[in-house]
């Protein structure tokens, strides 16, 4: 074992006893590079009782878990999936995979359901292809972490431009930057 790790010669002689970060760190195992596999480290170093950080004194799971969720105070938490009994408040958005694809619409203030539309009827409602691939559109699409997705490749046409051509309406802009400038100027002048 001193000269091989996982069947590869000479790997065992490099980096021995060097502290390392491993995917198993979250379960309380102190794995170092000299450990052969993850289950070797978990065999004797399992977290079985919670401890207070810094003091290294034992505590109850209730106290440990309440400390874990403390950063969630004054945060907006939403859940997509089956409703569960959590110790903090959250908005249940549903458990359908379709709901997950509507995150951006919810970020923009879209209210799901027919009643919300009846109370405040929109002048124009256009969600055509809301589930479509984001690589063919020039807009602000977000992923599950809220980061902006990729821009369209090459000569791909934007949906607003294609829709105006089909409707036979000439618009005073040709690019997304011109659209943003037009609406920013219009909203500032109001």
Swiss-Prot record:
The keyword Translocase applies. This is NADH-ubiquinone oxidoreductase 75 kDa subunit, mitochondrial. Belongs to the complex I 75 kDa subunit family. It is found in: Mitochondrion inner membrane. Its cofactor is [2Fe-2S] cluster; [4Fe-4S] cluster. It comes from the Eukaryota. Binds 1 [2Fe-2S] cluster per subunit. Binds 2 [4Fe-4S] clusters per subunit. One of its GO terms (biological process) is mitochondrial respiratory chain complex I assembly. The keyword Electron transport applies. Its EC number is 7.1.1.2. Its main location: mitochondrion. One of its GO terms (molecular function) is 2 iron, 2 sulfur cluster binding. It is an enzyme of class 7 (translocase).
